[in-house]
Amino acid sequence: MRRLFTQPQTVLTIAGSDSGGAAGLAADWKTFAALGAYGLGAITVVTAQNSQEVRQVQFVSPKMVVAQMEAVLEDYGAAAIKTGFIGSADTIRAIAECLSRWPEIPLVVDPVLVNHKGQAMFSPAVTEAYQQHLFPLATLITPNRHEAALLTGLPVTTREEMAAAAIQLHTFGPQHILIKGLQEGETMVDGWLDGDAVRARARARGNPSSSSRSSFHWLEGSRVETNNTHGSGDTLSAAAAVFLGQGLEMGVALRRAHEFVRGAIIAAADWQLGTGHGPVNPLFGFYNTDGGKHG
């Protein structure tokens, strides 16, 4: 019998379980599959949630999180790794210590720190653990504008403020920074600080601040009128991880990830799953928007 599929690359997500299937591991694995990758997972937290609320949270011990990571990395390996909801300073430190053994693997860190209203969910110790332990290992970090403000202490309400926050975040050690979710009228704006260009220009000019601002790029799209955006941040960071694992340059990976998550939002814009904040559809390439499978 002829084989129909080539062997996929493996991508590991270190994230939470969402019983509603919209965010966390569910969003990541759907995104990985849609883009041709095989998803591995290390669960950090189990949540009882739906489209309206999070009812209960049970954290997995740092030791068990690391055991999951080691089990898959030592056997399957990974073309890329991403982190999502962690929520514990001790677990962040344990994850960072484990990941330091695989510095060659691209690492995307999505620092989940605020709820959908932009309010901080955790103690300052969690923020500091990201800054001190995970960010220095990261190829890319993907905070939204509220998380960027929390991490830097700076306002992030304009493009200029977004660029300033990204420059501050770069001092914590990540190679690249993508800040998401600035709304300008009917346009949604994400900002990417190209860390490679920052370092190259700083060496050439000796002016890191000027070099940083000239290394900032914008990813824009018209706002989609929908309440179904739950899991969009996870989908974006998961897509970026897949593309980086394929060896794409950062700018190309981010633009493709940006296009992918926009497609996932549009495909689920009219869904009525639950009565609150509904999911996006990372599998839009496989299913029609009316729910019928292609083919």
Over which residues does each language-model region extend?
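Conserved N-terminal subdomain of the carbohydrate kinase-like
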Residues: 2-13, 31-117, 283-289
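Charged C-terminal helix
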Residues: 8, 59, 251-295
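Short pre-catalytic strand/loop immediately N-terminal to key active-site residues, enriched for Gly-Thr
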Residues: 14-20, 216-231
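Glycine- and other small-residue-rich loops at beta-strand/loop junctions that grip anionic moieties
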Residues: 17, 83-84, 119, 180, ...
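Conserved phosphate/ATP/ADP-binding segment of small-molecule kinases
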Residues: 124-217, 225
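Short, small-residue alpha-helix embedded
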Residues: 149-150, 228-250
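Short, well-structured alpha-helical segments that form the helix of a local strand-helix-strand
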Residues: 162-170, 217, 249-265
